Amino acid sequence: MRKFWILTLLALATVTASAEEVVMRAFKCQKQYHGIAVGGPIKVFVEERTEGNIIIRATERIHNALEIKVEDQTLKVTLDNFDIKRKSDTLQAEVYVPNNGALDEFTVLACGIIEVKPQIKAKDVEIECAAASRINIDVVADEVAIDILGASDAKVVAQCVSIEVDLTGASSLSLTGKATKGEFDIVGASSLKGSQFDCSQLELDCSGASTANISAEMADVDTTGASTANVTCTTQLTASAAGASTIRYSGDCKVDITNNSGASTIKRK
């Protein structure tokens, strides 16, 4: 019986020590910022609240390595010389940031994650996601620029006048919303999931082994390599396909084929 109680107490002590590894601290930001940049395996949550401190939830080791500062009007959240020794470390680095009403630039690198809960309203919004990172955001703006590369993943809801998207290096973008004008460059086995995004005027370049799905009134689509573009078009489609690429289209649109070379295919779905 004594041995049983000793083992039980040891187990409880182990659980308590494990629970005590994660601590919460507050960081009071003294400077104004309109951008957020995340570097490293950190989860940053932009919350609905508009004021208050930045809250960090992490292990003691991560707290010691975590650096939060405002530089060039950007809130930078990074890990300084941090060596991941435990699998749980990356799951316990969480930073909660209030929405100060001025945010319009979001950069996430090196396995970082940004989750933006409130809808962001700004004149221009810039989004960059690289090196196996992720972002989830809803924006209303005049101009939106999205750059996703290096096996990264983004989920974006955008209502804007114009949008410019660059996807490279096996990246993925799930896009919903609408724009008056859109320019899309999809390269290197990347994927655009935009069948629920409507564009009045669309320019789409798709190359490598990339895939793109999108809707537009007027569309200018160019595919090369082994890429595939699926376009729903209601007015005018200008299509150029080369290599082993494919353009599939649907909708009541006039079709102008400017190039259909190699083993490429342009056909109605």
Feature annotation, model-predicted:
Residues 1-269:
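Intrinsically disordered, low-complexity terminal regions
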